[in-house]
C-alpha cells in the first residue's frame, strides 16, 4: 500500500494499523514517526473538518508541504446554520494592509479551498517564529498570487507556539490555520493506541484566515461536534 496515495472522500479505518504493521521494523525511527503523524493528521482533518482529496506528498523536494487537500466548507456551514444564526456579514472585511471578500460570499457547492499542510511531529519543542516564517515562505512559493484568497495554509503539531511563533502566526499576511493534533501513543506492550490517541485537540485561525472564513462556522462545528452527526448520514 502506498502511503502517498490520494484519500478521496474518506480515510479507511485500518490505514494506520496497516502502516504500523508494514513498518514495524523501523518503529523507533524518525521517518516512521513522521509518516505516522502525517497519516494521523490526514485522518483527523478528513474526519473532523471533512477535507477531501488528501495526499501525503512530503519528501526531499516537497517545498515545505507535507500534505495537500481540498476543503468544501459548505456542508459544514449548512449543518451549523441549522443550529446557529450568524450576524449579517459585510461584503468585504478589512485586514491591516488590504481587504478581502469572505469565502462565505463566494462559496458554491463545487467550490473548494486548496489546502497546504505542514506537519511538525514534535515531542516537546514548541513551534518557533523561524518555523512560521518558513511556512509563510512555502505558501508564497506554492500558491500563485491570484489564488491566495482561495487557499489555506495549515500547520499541524502536537505542541503549541512560542511567544514569537504565535505573534508571527497571527500577523501573517496569508490565511493560516493551526491544528493541534496529538501523536499516536505507544502503550507499555509496544503496541500503538490508534483508536484513543492522535486526536484533533485544538483549531485556531490567524486574523487573515478568520476574516476569510468568517461565518463559515468552523469553530462552532468543532465545538458542537457536528462531524459526528454528518458521519452518521
Swiss-Prot record:
Protein name: Required for respiratory growth protein 7, mitochondrial
One example GO MF annotation: nucleic acid binding
Compartments where located: Mitochondrion
Keywords for this protein: Mitochondrion
Signal peptide coordinates: none
InterPro entries documented for this protein: RRG7, tRNA_endonuc-like_dom_sf
Pfam families found in the cross-reference section: RRG7 (PF10356)
PANTHER family reported for this sequence: REQUIRED FOR RESPIRATORY GROWTH PROTEIN 7, MITOCHONDRIAL (PTHR28133:SF1)
Domain of life: Eukaryota
Family: Belongs to the RRG7 family.
Gene3D superfamilies: 3.40.1350.10
Record's GO cellular component terms: mitochondrion
Amino acid at each position: 500500500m502506498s502511503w502517498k496515495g490520494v484519500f478521496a472522500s474518506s480515510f479507511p479505518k485500518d490505514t494506520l494499523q496497516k502502516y504500523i504493521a508494514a513498518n514495524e521494523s523501523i518503529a523507533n525511527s524518525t521517518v516512521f514517526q513522521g509518516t505516522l503523524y502525517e497519516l494521523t493528521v490526514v485522518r483527523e482533518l478528513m474526519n473532523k473538518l471533512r477535507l477531501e482529496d488528501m495526499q501525503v506528498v512530503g519528501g526531499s523536494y516537497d517545498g515545505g508541504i507535507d500534505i495537500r487537500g481540498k476543503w468544501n466548507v459548505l456542508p459544514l456551514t449548512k449543518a451549523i446554520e441549522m443550529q446557529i444564526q450568524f450576524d449579517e456579514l459585510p461584503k468585504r472585511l478589512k485586514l491591516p494592509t488590504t481587504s478581502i471578500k469572505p469565502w462565505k460570499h463566494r462559496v458554491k457547492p463545487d467550490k473548494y479551498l486548496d489546502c497546504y499542510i505542514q506537519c511538525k511531529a514534535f515531542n516537546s519543542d514548541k513551534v518557533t517564529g523561524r518555523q512560521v516564517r518558513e511556512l509563510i515562505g512555502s505558501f508564497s512559493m506554492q500558491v500563485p498570487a491570484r489564488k491566495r484568497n482561495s487557499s489555506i495554509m495549515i500547520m499541524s503539531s502536537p505542541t503549541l507556539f512560542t511567544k514569537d511563533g504565535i505573534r508571527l502566526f497571527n500577523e501573517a499576511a496569508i490565511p493560516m490555520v493551526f491544528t493541534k493534533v496529538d501523536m499516536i501513543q505507544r502503550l507499555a506492550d509496544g503496541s500503538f493506541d490508534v483508536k484513543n490517541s492522535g486526536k484533533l485537540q485544538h483549531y485556531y485561525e490567524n486574523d487573515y484566515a478568520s476574516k476569510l472564513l468568517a461565518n463559515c462556522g468552523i469553530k462552532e462545528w468543532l465545538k458542537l461536534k457536528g462531524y459526528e452527526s454528518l458521519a452518521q448520514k
